[in-house]
UniProtKB/Swiss-Prot annotation:
The gene is entS. The lineage of its organism: Bacteria, Pseudomonadati, Pseudomonadota, Gammaproteobacteria, Enterobacterales. It is found in: Cell inner membrane. Belongs to the major facilitator superfamily. EntS (TC 2.A.1.38) family. The keyword Flavoprotein does not apply. This is Enterobactin exporter EntS. Residues 43-55, 105-109, 178, 240-256, 308-313, 378 are periplasmic. It comes from the Bacteria. The chain crosses the membrane at residues 22-42, 56-76, 84-104, 110-130, 157-177, 179-199, 219-239, 257-277, 288-307, 314-336, 357-377, 379-399. Keywords: Cell inner membrane, Cell membrane, Membrane, Transmembrane, Transmembrane helix, Transport.
Protein backbone atom coordinates (compact mmCIF):
# COMPACT_ATOMS: atom_id res chain seq x y z
CA UNK A 1 0.00 0.00 0.00
CA UNK A 2 1.29 3.46 -0.91
CA UNK A 3 2.25 5.22 2.31
CA UNK A 4 1.84 8.63 0.63
CA UNK A 5 -1.78 8.07 -0.38
CA UNK A 6 -4.91 8.30 1.77
CA UNK A 7 -6.91 6.61 -0.97
CA UNK A 8 -7.72 2.91 -0.81
CA UNK A 9 -5.40 0.74 -2.90
CA UNK A 10 -7.37 -1.86 -4.88
CA UNK A 11 -4.29 -3.79 -6.02
CA UNK A 12 -5.17 -6.64 -3.64
CA UNK A 13 -7.77 -7.72 -6.21
CA UNK A 14 -4.99 -8.09 -8.78
CA UNK A 15 -2.32 -9.75 -6.66
CA UNK A 16 -4.52 -12.22 -4.71
CA UNK A 17 -6.73 -14.35 -7.01
CA UNK A 18 -8.44 -16.04 -4.05
CA UNK A 19 -9.53 -12.70 -2.61
CA UNK A 20 -10.70 -11.61 -6.07
CA UNK A 21 -12.91 -14.71 -6.19
CA UNK A 22 -14.33 -13.88 -2.76
CA UNK A 23 -14.90 -10.26 -3.87
CA UNK A 24 -16.93 -11.36 -6.90
CA UNK A 25 -18.90 -13.93 -4.91
CA UNK A 26 -19.65 -11.47 -2.12
CA UNK A 27 -20.86 -8.75 -4.50
CA UNK A 28 -23.17 -11.14 -6.38
CA UNK A 29 -24.40 -12.52 -3.06
CA UNK A 30 -25.19 -9.06 -1.66
CA UNK A 31 -27.19 -8.16 -4.77
CA UNK A 32 -29.04 -11.50 -4.56
CA UNK A 33 -29.87 -11.03 -0.88
CA UNK A 34 -30.99 -7.48 -1.65
CA UNK A 35 -33.48 -8.77 -4.21
CA UNK A 36 -34.79 -11.13 -1.55
CA UNK A 37 -34.94 -8.35 1.06
CA UNK A 38 -37.24 -6.31 -1.19
CA UNK A 39 -39.46 -9.20 -2.30
CA UNK A 40 -40.29 -10.91 1.01
CA UNK A 41 -41.82 -7.88 2.81
CA UNK A 42 -43.76 -6.85 -0.31
CA UNK A 43 -45.18 -10.35 -0.84
CA UNK A 44 -46.21 -10.75 2.80
CA UNK A 45 -47.80 -7.28 2.83
CA UNK A 46 -49.75 -8.09 -0.35
CA UNK A 47 -50.92 -11.42 1.09
CA UNK A 48 -51.83 -10.28 4.62
CA UNK A 49 -52.08 -6.45 4.55
CA UNK A 50 -50.46 -6.65 7.98
CA UNK A 51 -47.30 -4.80 8.98
CA UNK A 52 -47.15 -7.06 12.04
CA UNK A 53 -46.79 -10.11 9.78
CA UNK A 54 -44.03 -8.34 7.85
CA UNK A 55 -42.24 -7.54 11.10
CA UNK A 56 -42.61 -11.14 12.25
CA UNK A 57 -40.81 -12.40 9.14
CA UNK A 58 -37.93 -9.98 9.78
CA UNK A 59 -37.72 -11.07 13.43
CA UNK A 60 -37.75 -14.78 12.56
CA UNK A 61 -35.06 -14.35 9.91
CA UNK A 62 -32.96 -12.30 12.32
CA UNK A 63 -33.24 -15.02 14.96
CA UNK A 64 -32.20 -17.67 12.44
CA UNK A 65 -29.24 -15.52 11.41
CA UNK A 66 -28.10 -15.23 15.02
CA UNK A 67 -28.22 -19.01 15.50
CA UNK A 68 -26.47 -19.49 12.15
CA UNK A 69 -23.64 -17.19 13.21
CA UNK A 70 -23.12 -19.14 16.42
CA UNK A 71 -23.25 -22.55 14.72
CA UNK A 72 -21.15 -21.30 11.80
CA UNK A 73 -18.46 -20.09 14.17
CA UNK A 74 -18.12 -23.53 15.72
CA UNK A 75 -18.15 -25.30 12.32
CA UNK A 76 -15.57 -22.90 10.85
CA UNK A 77 -13.16 -23.78 13.67
CA UNK A 78 -13.78 -27.52 13.30
CA UNK A 79 -14.11 -28.33 9.59
CA UNK A 80 -12.32 -27.32 6.40
CA UNK A 81 -13.63 -23.80 5.78
CA UNK A 82 -14.00 -23.98 2.00
CA UNK A 83 -16.40 -26.93 2.36
CA UNK A 84 -18.44 -25.03 4.97
CA UNK A 85 -18.66 -21.98 2.68
CA UNK A 86 -19.75 -24.00 -0.37
CA UNK A 87 -22.26 -26.09 1.59
CA UNK A 88 -23.84 -23.00 3.14
CA UNK A 89 -24.13 -21.13 -0.18
CA UNK A 90 -25.57 -24.09 -2.06
CA UNK A 91 -28.10 -24.89 0.66
CA UNK A 92 -29.14 -21.23 0.83
CA UNK A 93 -29.80 -21.25 -2.92
CA UNK A 94 -32.17 -24.21 -2.53
CA UNK A 95 -34.24 -22.08 -0.15
CA UNK A 96 -34.43 -19.30 -2.75
CA UNK A 97 -35.70 -21.81 -5.32
CA UNK A 98 -38.38 -22.81 -2.83
CA UNK A 99 -39.49 -19.19 -2.47
CA UNK A 100 -39.64 -18.84 -6.25
CA UNK A 101 -41.76 -21.99 -6.67
CA UNK A 102 -44.05 -20.89 -3.83
CA UNK A 103 -44.53 -17.46 -5.45
CA UNK A 104 -45.60 -19.11 -8.73
CA UNK A 105 -48.38 -21.12 -7.05
CA UNK A 106 -51.99 -19.94 -7.51
CA UNK A 107 -52.18 -19.43 -3.73
CA UNK A 108 -48.68 -18.99 -2.21
CA UNK A 109 -48.21 -20.33 1.31
CA UNK A 110 -47.43 -17.78 4.03
CA UNK A 111 -46.09 -20.56 6.27
CA UNK A 112 -43.66 -21.59 3.51
CA UNK A 113 -42.33 -18.03 3.31
CA UNK A 114 -41.70 -17.99 7.06
CA UNK A 115 -40.04 -21.42 7.07
CA UNK A 116 -37.86 -20.68 4.05
CA UNK A 117 -36.92 -17.35 5.64
CA UNK A 118 -35.64 -19.29 8.66
CA UNK A 119 -33.78 -21.67 6.33
CA UNK A 120 -32.11 -18.91 4.32
CA UNK A 121 -31.28 -16.76 7.34
CA UNK A 122 -29.56 -19.69 9.05
CA UNK A 123 -27.48 -20.92 6.12
CA UNK A 124 -26.60 -17.44 4.78
CA UNK A 125 -25.09 -16.39 8.12
CA UNK A 126 -23.38 -19.76 8.56
CA UNK A 127 -21.43 -19.18 5.34
CA UNK A 128 -20.56 -15.58 6.27
CA UNK A 129 -18.82 -16.71 9.46
CA UNK A 130 -16.68 -19.28 7.65
CA UNK A 131 -15.73 -16.74 4.98
CA UNK A 132 -14.67 -14.17 7.57
CA UNK A 133 -12.58 -16.75 9.40
CA UNK A 134 -10.87 -17.74 6.14
CA UNK A 135 -9.95 -14.17 5.09
CA UNK A 136 -6.60 -13.94 6.96
CA UNK A 137 -5.39 -17.10 5.20
CA UNK A 138 -6.49 -15.74 1.80
CA UNK A 139 -4.85 -12.29 1.96
CA UNK A 140 -2.31 -12.48 4.78
CA UNK A 141 -2.78 -10.69 8.08
CA UNK A 142 -0.69 -7.75 6.85
CA UNK A 143 -3.36 -7.00 4.20
CA UNK A 144 -6.46 -7.33 6.39
CA UNK A 145 -7.16 -3.59 6.65
CA UNK A 146 -7.07 -3.24 2.86
CA UNK A 147 -9.26 -6.33 2.44
CA UNK A 148 -11.74 -5.02 5.00
CA UNK A 149 -12.02 -1.65 3.26
CA UNK A 150 -12.57 -3.26 -0.15
CA UNK A 151 -15.21 -5.52 1.39
CA UNK A 152 -16.95 -2.52 2.97
CA UNK A 153 -17.09 -0.81 -0.42
CA UNK A 154 -18.51 -4.00 -1.94
CA UNK A 155 -21.25 -4.16 0.68
CA UNK A 156 -22.17 -0.48 0.30
CA UNK A 157 -22.25 -0.63 -3.50
CA UNK A 158 -24.29 -3.83 -3.52
CA UNK A 159 -26.69 -2.40 -0.93
CA UNK A 160 -27.38 0.58 -3.18
CA UNK A 161 -27.81 -1.40 -6.41
CA UNK A 162 -29.91 -4.33 -5.16
CA UNK A 163 -32.97 -2.43 -3.79
CA UNK A 164 -33.17 -0.38 -7.00
CA UNK A 165 -32.97 -3.53 -9.13
CA UNK A 166 -35.42 -5.31 -6.84
CA UNK A 167 -37.96 -2.50 -7.19
CA UNK A 168 -37.69 -2.56 -10.99
CA UNK A 169 -38.21 -6.35 -11.04
CA UNK A 170 -41.23 -6.08 -8.73
CA UNK A 171 -42.81 -3.46 -10.96
CA UNK A 172 -42.22 -5.43 -14.16
CA UNK A 173 -42.42 -9.12 -13.30
CA UNK A 174 -43.53 -9.71 -9.71
CA UNK A 175 -41.80 -11.32 -6.72
CA UNK A 176 -41.09 -14.61 -8.52
CA UNK A 177 -38.50 -12.84 -10.67
CA UNK A 178 -36.76 -11.53 -7.55
CA UNK A 179 -36.62 -14.98 -5.99
CA UNK A 180 -35.54 -16.64 -9.22
CA UNK A 181 -32.69 -14.21 -9.85
CA UNK A 182 -31.65 -14.40 -6.19
CA UNK A 183 -31.39 -18.19 -6.53
CA UNK A 184 -29.47 -17.92 -9.81
CA UNK A 185 -27.10 -15.37 -8.31
CA UNK A 186 -26.45 -17.55 -5.28
CA UNK A 187 -25.53 -20.57 -7.41
CA UNK A 188 -23.35 -18.37 -9.64
CA UNK A 189 -21.32 -17.41 -6.54
CA UNK A 190 -20.29 -21.06 -6.26
CA UNK A 191 -18.20 -20.74 -9.45
CA UNK A 192 -15.58 -18.30 -8.08
CA UNK A 193 -15.72 -19.93 -4.64
CA UNK A 194 -14.82 -23.32 -6.15
CA UNK A 195 -11.47 -21.83 -7.19
CA UNK A 196 -10.49 -21.12 -3.57
CA UNK A 197 -7.62 -23.17 -2.12
CA UNK A 198 -8.25 -25.64 0.68
CA UNK A 199 -8.73 -23.80 3.96
CA UNK A 200 -7.90 -26.30 6.72
CA UNK A 201 -8.27 -25.38 10.38
CA UNK A 202 -5.52 -25.84 13.01
CA UNK A 203 -5.55 -29.21 14.80
CA UNK A 204 -7.54 -29.04 18.02
CA UNK A 205 -9.28 -31.48 20.36
CA UNK A 206 -12.85 -32.47 19.58
CA UNK A 207 -15.31 -31.09 22.12
CA UNK A 208 -19.01 -30.52 22.54
CA UNK A 209 -20.15 -27.60 20.31
CA UNK A 210 -21.69 -25.81 23.29
CA UNK A 211 -18.44 -26.14 25.23
CA UNK A 212 -16.55 -24.82 22.20
CA UNK A 213 -18.86 -21.80 22.02
CA UNK A 214 -18.54 -21.28 25.77
CA UNK A 215 -14.76 -21.26 25.38
CA UNK A 216 -15.12 -18.41 22.88
CA UNK A 217 -17.26 -16.44 25.34
CA UNK A 218 -14.66 -17.00 28.06
CA UNK A 219 -11.89 -15.81 25.73
CA UNK A 220 -13.95 -12.72 24.86
CA UNK A 221 -14.54 -11.83 28.51
CA UNK A 222 -10.97 -12.61 29.57
CA UNK A 223 -9.36 -10.45 26.88
CA UNK A 224 -9.66 -6.70 27.59
CA UNK A 225 -8.55 -5.99 24.02
CA UNK A 226 -10.97 -8.28 22.14
CA UNK A 227 -13.76 -7.65 24.65
CA UNK A 228 -13.37 -3.90 24.26
CA UNK A 229 -13.48 -4.19 20.47
CA UNK A 230 -16.70 -6.22 20.63
CA UNK A 231 -18.30 -3.74 23.06
CA UNK A 232 -17.47 -0.77 20.85
CA UNK A 233 -18.83 -2.60 17.80
CA UNK A 234 -22.13 -3.24 19.54
CA UNK A 235 -22.48 0.40 20.60
CA UNK A 236 -21.73 1.71 17.09
CA UNK A 237 -24.39 -0.62 15.69
CA UNK A 238 -26.87 0.58 18.31
CA UNK A 239 -26.20 4.18 17.25
CA UNK A 240 -26.95 3.35 13.60
CA UNK A 241 -30.50 2.39 14.62
CA UNK A 242 -31.31 6.13 14.62
CA UNK A 243 -32.72 5.50 11.13
CA UNK A 244 -36.01 4.37 12.74
CA UNK A 245 -36.60 8.05 13.58
CA UNK A 246 -36.03 9.34 10.03
CA UNK A 247 -39.73 9.48 9.01
CA UNK A 248 -40.73 11.42 12.14
CA UNK A 249 -37.76 13.79 11.93
CA UNK A 250 -38.44 14.36 8.23
CA UNK A 251 -41.90 15.65 9.14
CA UNK A 252 -40.44 18.17 11.60
CA UNK A 253 -38.04 19.36 8.88
CA UNK A 254 -40.90 19.38 6.31
CA UNK A 255 -38.87 17.27 3.89
CA UNK A 256 -40.22 15.98 0.59
CA UNK A 257 -40.28 12.27 -0.26
CA UNK A 258 -37.19 12.66 -2.45
CA UNK A 259 -35.33 14.50 0.31
CA UNK A 260 -36.13 11.76 2.84
CA UNK A 261 -34.15 9.38 0.64
CA UNK A 262 -31.07 11.51 1.31
CA UNK A 263 -31.34 10.69 5.03
CA UNK A 264 -31.17 6.98 4.25
CA UNK A 265 -28.31 7.47 1.79
CA UNK A 266 -26.17 9.68 4.04
CA UNK A 267 -24.67 7.02 6.34
CA UNK A 268 -23.78 4.56 3.52
CA UNK A 269 -22.25 7.45 1.57
CA UNK A 270 -20.16 8.52 4.56
CA UNK A 271 -19.08 4.93 5.16
CA UNK A 272 -18.06 4.55 1.51
CA UNK A 273 -15.95 7.72 1.77
CA UNK A 274 -14.41 6.33 4.95
CA UNK A 275 -13.45 3.13 3.18
CA UNK A 276 -12.11 4.98 0.12
CA UNK A 277 -9.90 7.22 2.27
CA UNK A 278 -8.56 4.46 4.51
CA UNK A 279 -5.25 4.07 2.69
CA UNK A 280 -3.15 5.22 5.66
CA UNK A 281 -5.24 3.55 8.36
CA UNK A 282 -3.32 0.26 8.28
CA UNK A 283 -0.11 2.13 9.13
CA UNK A 284 -1.45 3.72 12.32
CA UNK A 285 0.73 2.90 15.31
CA UNK A 286 -2.09 3.28 17.86
CA UNK A 287 -5.20 1.79 16.21
CA UNK A 288 -6.98 1.31 19.54
CA UNK A 289 -6.88 5.01 20.38
CA UNK A 290 -8.05 5.96 16.88
CA UNK A 291 -10.89 3.44 17.21
CA UNK A 292 -12.02 4.89 20.55
CA UNK A 293 -11.85 8.52 19.40
CA UNK A 294 -13.63 7.85 16.09
CA UNK A 295 -16.34 5.93 17.95
CA UNK A 296 -16.98 8.80 20.38
CA UNK A 297 -16.98 11.23 17.44
CA UNK A 298 -19.58 9.13 15.63
CA UNK A 299 -21.84 9.21 18.71
CA UNK A 300 -21.48 13.00 18.86
CA UNK A 301 -22.57 13.23 15.22
CA UNK A 302 -25.75 11.28 16.06
CA UNK A 303 -26.46 13.55 19.03
CA UNK A 304 -26.09 16.68 16.88
CA UNK A 305 -28.03 15.24 13.93
CA UNK A 306 -31.57 15.75 15.25
CA UNK A 307 -31.06 19.23 16.70
CA UNK A 308 -29.83 20.73 13.44
CA UNK A 309 -32.09 23.63 12.35
CA UNK A 310 -32.19 22.52 8.69
CA UNK A 311 -32.30 19.06 7.16
CA UNK A 312 -29.16 19.56 5.04
CA UNK A 313 -27.11 20.00 8.22
CA UNK A 314 -28.70 16.81 9.56
CA UNK A 315 -27.66 14.92 6.42
CA UNK A 316 -24.08 16.17 6.87
CA UNK A 317 -24.09 14.90 10.48
CA UNK A 318 -25.29 11.48 9.30
CA UNK A 319 -22.58 11.35 6.63
CA UNK A 320 -20.03 12.25 9.32
CA UNK A 321 -21.37 9.41 11.46
CA UNK A 322 -20.99 7.05 8.49
CA UNK A 323 -17.38 8.15 7.92
CA UNK A 324 -16.32 7.89 11.57
CA UNK A 325 -18.15 4.61 12.16
CA UNK A 326 -16.47 3.16 9.04
CA UNK A 327 -13.05 4.02 10.48
CA UNK A 328 -14.00 2.42 13.79
CA UNK A 329 -15.43 -0.69 12.09
CA UNK A 330 -12.36 -1.20 9.88
CA UNK A 331 -10.08 -1.04 12.91
CA UNK A 332 -12.38 -3.38 14.86
CA UNK A 333 -12.30 -5.92 12.01
CA UNK A 334 -8.53 -5.74 11.57
CA UNK A 335 -7.63 -5.99 15.26
CA UNK A 336 -10.11 -8.81 15.79
CA UNK A 337 -8.59 -10.81 12.93
CA UNK A 338 -4.98 -10.14 13.89
CA UNK A 339 -5.27 -10.55 17.67
CA UNK A 340 -7.49 -13.67 17.73
CA UNK A 341 -5.79 -17.09 17.72
CA UNK A 342 -6.26 -19.00 14.45
CA UNK A 343 -8.15 -21.82 16.16
CA UNK A 344 -10.80 -19.36 17.45
CA UNK A 345 -11.27 -17.17 14.37
CA UNK A 346 -14.54 -18.82 13.35
CA UNK A 347 -16.22 -18.47 16.73
CA UNK A 348 -14.95 -14.93 17.36
CA UNK A 349 -16.09 -13.75 13.93
CA UNK A 350 -19.46 -15.32 14.62
CA UNK A 351 -19.77 -13.51 17.95
CA UNK A 352 -18.59 -10.21 16.46
CA UNK A 353 -21.07 -10.41 13.58
CA UNK A 354 -23.85 -11.49 15.95
CA UNK A 355 -23.36 -8.42 18.12
CA UNK A 356 -23.95 -6.32 15.00
CA UNK A 357 -27.29 -8.07 14.49
CA UNK A 358 -28.35 -7.79 18.14
CA UNK A 359 -26.96 -4.27 18.61
CA UNK A 360 -29.16 -2.95 15.82
CA UNK A 361 -32.25 -4.62 17.27
CA UNK A 362 -31.52 -3.35 20.79
CA UNK A 363 -30.88 0.17 19.50
CA UNK A 364 -34.15 0.21 17.57
CA UNK A 365 -36.06 -1.03 20.64
CA UNK A 366 -34.47 1.59 22.92
CA UNK A 367 -35.22 4.39 20.46
CA UNK A 368 -38.78 3.13 20.17
CA UNK A 369 -39.10 3.26 23.96
CA UNK A 370 -37.66 6.77 24.11
CA UNK A 371 -40.01 7.82 21.32
CA UNK A 372 -42.98 6.84 23.47
CA UNK A 373 -41.82 9.21 26.23
CA UNK A 374 -40.38 12.18 24.30
CA UNK A 375 -40.25 13.81 20.89
CA UNK A 376 -38.25 12.27 18.02
CA UNK A 377 -35.73 15.13 18.23
CA UNK A 378 -35.22 14.53 21.94
CA UNK A 379 -35.02 10.74 21.45
CA UNK A 380 -32.23 10.99 18.87
CA UNK A 381 -30.31 13.59 20.87
CA UNK A 382 -30.59 11.76 24.18
CA UNK A 383 -29.45 8.49 22.61
CA UNK A 384 -26.53 10.15 20.81
CA UNK A 385 -25.26 12.21 23.74
CA UNK A 386 -25.87 9.29 26.11
CA UNK A 387 -23.60 7.15 23.93
CA UNK A 388 -21.02 9.97 23.95
CA UNK A 389 -20.89 9.76 27.76
CA UNK A 390 -20.56 5.97 27.62
CA UNK A 391 -17.86 6.29 24.96
CA UNK A 392 -15.85 8.77 27.05
CA UNK A 393 -16.07 6.41 30.04
CA UNK A 394 -14.83 3.54 27.87
CA UNK A 395 -11.99 5.76 26.64
CA UNK A 396 -10.83 5.87 30.26
CA UNK A 397 -11.72 2.29 31.25
CA UNK A 398 -10.39 0.38 28.22
CA UNK A 399 -6.77 1.14 28.98
CA UNK A 400 -5.30 -1.87 27.16
CA UNK A 401 -7.14 -1.00 23.96
CA UNK A 402 -6.25 2.69 24.28
CA UNK A 403 -2.54 1.96 24.80
CA UNK A 404 -2.31 -0.83 22.21
CA UNK A 405 0.52 -0.29 19.73
CA UNK A 406 1.34 -2.19 16.58
CA UNK A 407 4.14 -2.26 14.06
CA UNK A 408 2.76 -0.93 10.75
CA UNK A 409 2.46 -3.86 8.31
CA UNK A 410 4.50 -4.05 5.14
CA UNK A 411 1.97 -5.01 2.46
CA UNK A 412 2.95 -6.99 -0.60
CA UNK A 413 -0.19 -5.98 -2.40
CA UNK A 414 1.07 -2.96 -4.15
Amino acid sequence: MNRQSWLLNLSLLKTHPAFRAVFLARFISIVSLGLLGVAVPVQIQMMTHSTWQVGLSVTLTGGAMFIGLMVGGVLADRYERKKVILLARGTCGIGFIGLCVNALLPEPSLLAIYLLGLWDGFFASLGVTALLAATPALVGRENLMQAGAITMLTVRLGSVISPMLGGILLASGGVAWNYGLAAAGTFITLLPLLTLPRLPVPPQPRENPFIALLAAFRFLLASPLIGGIALLGGLVTMASAVRVLYPALAMSWQMSAAQIGLLYAAIPLGAAIGALTSGQLAHSVRPGLIMLVSTVGSFLAVGLFAIMPIWIAGVICLALFGWLSAISSLLQYTLLQTQTPENMLGRMNGLWTAQNVTGDAIGAALLGGLGAMMTPVASASVSGFGLVIIGLLLLLVLGELRRFRQTPPVSDAG
